[in-house]
Structures are given as structure tokens and as C-alpha cells.
């Protein structure tokens, strides 16, 4: 077997030399304010000497330039104040955002590497990976500043190179990265640092294949135990599986990630769309989808409701509304239209329960809200052709609450009683 990429901890000499040259190039700027103007001038000083002719070297040179500037911009704030990215000053934050945008644009272009790529080109790539890894696990800055670059260099540049190789060689390379990451366990108890370390390992294990999914997911769940964990920081597991059209494995990951994603509402719409793609290709996975969506409750309530309506599960939708104490006033008429058209009688308890809830406030605002729902309820009884039943109800309702003058006024305004 052959190690396709020299996975090592030390940064390659050529990459070190680039960074040394960067420092010399921007020295005339001194310790200026780390804003967009500073980074623009610094990049101009570095690039004015020209770029390497070799397209692979040029891409890696530019990437290292942006990464170096990212380090320079972020480090002073975090070294002096021990703060994270969220605490950066406004202008510094803009500079970081611009650099990260440039990095993303660079990764969007393929790195022209093949199985016959020269040793020198591989060393540039390996050295750049080492640099990113070191910065990601550095105790002097927010690890997630460089975590995204770590993921992108694997997804966009290294993994495409591995696709030209035999399976055993790919596994050997990924194993080497896992082993190195394990050796680099952060000594600091800093939460973001540990999370980056766990998630980096999780991602490499994920790329090794389905047989490592349990290991990968266990690392995610470990990271998710931290209070400051954000699901948005997770690598693109779901997108990767979608690109591979691996629907069975995608269904498994969607199910297993539900407990993690329920911690935050972000990206749940995307999560629901992934399920739609799975069910389109793999209809037998529908029971898994319902299990996963139930795990997302209560945070994923809206997603769950939408799915119940789109799949025509009217009774389950209504049971959920009643148990959750939801209010029909919070829904647009168009949102309830599928139920009105297919099972309108099921909406009756939903409206009646909400009316009583608003009545319990015992103030004019509550009465107004109740009357608004009663007007919609009247239309619903008319739709199901049970107007006599409605007339009996509203008459008894008004009589039962005859002493509530404010309510009586609202009922008359709503033309519900004479």
C-alpha cells in the first residue's frame, strides 16, 4: 500500500518559507488596525512580486497567503483579550469575513492534482494541511476560525486526489490522519478547541466509510455535550452523502443526527429537504423519517407539522396540536387549507380548545382573540353543513358568559350575536 499524501505534523519547509516571506512583505505596515484596508494593503504587498507559474503551487500559495493573513488578523485580539471570533471588533470581523470569502472562492476551483502529481506538489499540499491543522488546534485562537478550512481542503482538494487511488491506499491515508489527530489531543480544556478536535476526527472517520459511522457519530455526540456547541459547526456529512447518492446511509445519518440538531433550530428546513430526497429515492425509509422528526420535538415542531400535512396524516397532526397547546391563530388560513379541504371536522376541537384558552385570560384582549377564532369556527361549521350545531353552541356560549360585558360587546362587533 502507498501513502498518497504525506500526513505529518510538521509544516513543510516550502510552506514555512512562504510564511516567512509573507511576514517580511507586510512588515512596512507595522501594527496597524486589523481591518479590511489593512488586509487589502497586505495582500497587495505579497502579491506584487507575482505568483508562481505552476497552477498547483499558485493555488496553494494563494491559500497560504489568505490563511496567514487570517492568522495575523485574529491572533492579536485573541492573544491579548482571550476572546473568540464573536468578540472581534466590527472592522476586524469584516476583514475576517472577506478573507474567509476569498478562501471559499479558492476552494471552489479544483486543484489540478492527479495520481502522477509530483512529489513537490504533494509536499505543498501536505504542508498546507499541516499548517491548517496546527492553527485549528492552536490554543491561542478560536479553533473554528480554521476548522472550516480544514474541512474544505479535505473535501475540495485532498479527497478528489484520493479518488484516483485504490481503496487500500485511500484507507491508509485516512488512517494516518486519524492517528495524527489522536496524538494532537489538546491539553487545554477550552471547549471550542476540544470541539474542533472531536469534529475533525469525526469527519475523517466518516470519510473512511459506513463501517466507521458509529465511531464518527460518537465523536459528534461527545462534542454536542458542550454548552457552547452549535450544530451549524458540523461538517457537511449530509451534503456529502447526497452528492454520493448514498440514500440508505443518508437516512441513517439523518436519523442519528436528530438528537444533535434539536439543540438548535438552524438548518432544520434543509434537514427536512434532505429527508424529501431520501424518501423520493427510498420510499421504504419513511418510518425512519417519522422517528427522526419526533426526536426533533419540540424544537422541530413546525417541520413535523408540515410533514404531517404534506403526507396527509390529519389525525396525527391534530393530536400534536392539541397536546402541544398550539393556537390556530398562529397559522395562516392557507396553512390550514389542506386540513379544511380533506378533514375539516378535525379542526373543530383545535378551535374550541383555543377559544377556551383565550377566554381564561378574562380581559378584553383575550375576548377579542376568542371572537376572532369563533368567526373562523362559524365558517368551518358552515363548510361541514352543521350550522344548527353552531347556532346552538354560540347561543349557549353567549348565555353562559352573559355577565362578561366586554365579551358581549366583542361578540356583537363580530356579528356573532344580535
Locations of the language-model features?
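Eukaryote-biased, non-catalytic alpha-solenoid scaffold regions
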Residues: 2-418
Amino acid at each position: 500500500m502507498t501513502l498518497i499524501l504525506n500526513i505529518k505534523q510538521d509544516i513543510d519547509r516550502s510552506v514555512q518559507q512562504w510564511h516567512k516571506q509573507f511576514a517580511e512583505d507586510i512588515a512596512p505596515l507595522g501594527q496597524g488596525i486589523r481591518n479590511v484596508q489593512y488586509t487589502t494593503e497586505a495582500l497587495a504587498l505579497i502579491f506584487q512580486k507575482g505568483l508562481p507559474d505552476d497552477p498547483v503551487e499558485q493555488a496553494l500559495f494563494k491559500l497560504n497567503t489568505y490563511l496567514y493573513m487570517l492568522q495575523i488578523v485574529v491572533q492579536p485580539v485573541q492573544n491579548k483579550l482571550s476572546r473568540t471570533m464573536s468578540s472581534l471588533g466590527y472592522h476586524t470581523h469584516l476583514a475576517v469575513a472577506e478573507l474567509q470569502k476569498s478562501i471559499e472562492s479558492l476552494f471552489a476551483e479544483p486543484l489540478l492534482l492527479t495520481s502522477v502529481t509530483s512529489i513537490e506538489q504533494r509536499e505543498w499540499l501536505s504542508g498546507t494541511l499541516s499548517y491548517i491543522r496546527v492553527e485549528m488546534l492552536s490554543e491561542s485562537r478560536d479553533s473554528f476560525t480554521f476548522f472550516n478550512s480544514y474541512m474544505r481542503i479535505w473535501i475540495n482538494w485532498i479527497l478528489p486526489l484520493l479518488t484516483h487511488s485504490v481503496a487500500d491506499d485511500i484507507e491508509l491515508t485516512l488512517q494516518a490522519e486519524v492517528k495524527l489527530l489522536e496524538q494532537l489531543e489538546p491539553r487545554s480544556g477550552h471547549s471550542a478547541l476540544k470541539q474542533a478536535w472531536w469534529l475533525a476526527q469525526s469527519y475523517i472517520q466518516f470519510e473512511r466509510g459506513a463501517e466507521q459511522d458509529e465511531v464518527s457519530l460518537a465523536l459528534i455526540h461527545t462534542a454536542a455535550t458542550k454548552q457552547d456547541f452549535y450544530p451549524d459547526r458540523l461538517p457537511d456529512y449530509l451534503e456529502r452523502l447526497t452528492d454520493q447518492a448514498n440514500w440508505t446511509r443518508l437516512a441513517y445519518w439523518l436519523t442519528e443526527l436528530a438528537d444533535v440538531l434539536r439543540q438548535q433550530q438552524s438548518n432544520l428546513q434543509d434537514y427536512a429537504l434532505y429527508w424529501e430526497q431520501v424518501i423520493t429515492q427510498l420510499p421504504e425509509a419513511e418510518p425512519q423519517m417519522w422517528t427522526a422528526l419526533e426526536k426533533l420535538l419540540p424544537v422541530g415542531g413546525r417541520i413535523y407539522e408540515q410533514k404531517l400535512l404534506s403526507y396527509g396524516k390529519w389525525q396525527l397532526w391534530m393530536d400534536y396540536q392539541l397536546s402541544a397547546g398550539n393556537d390556530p391563530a398562529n397559522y395562516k388560513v392557507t396553512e390550514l387549507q389542506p386540513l379544511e379541504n380533506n378533514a375539516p371536522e378535525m379542526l373543530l376541537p383545535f378551535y374550541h380548545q383555543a377559544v377556551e384558552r383565550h377566554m381564561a385570560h378574562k380581559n378584553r384582549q383575550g375576548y377579542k382573540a376568542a371572537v376572532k377564532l369563533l368567526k373562523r369556527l362559524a365558517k368551518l361549521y358552515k363548510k361541514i353543513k352543521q350550522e344548527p350545531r353552531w347556532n346552538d353552541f354560540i347561543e349557549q356560549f353567549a348565555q353562559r358568559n352573559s355577565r362578561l360585558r366586554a365579551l358581549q360587546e366583542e361578540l356583537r362587533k363580530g356579528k356573532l350575536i344580535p
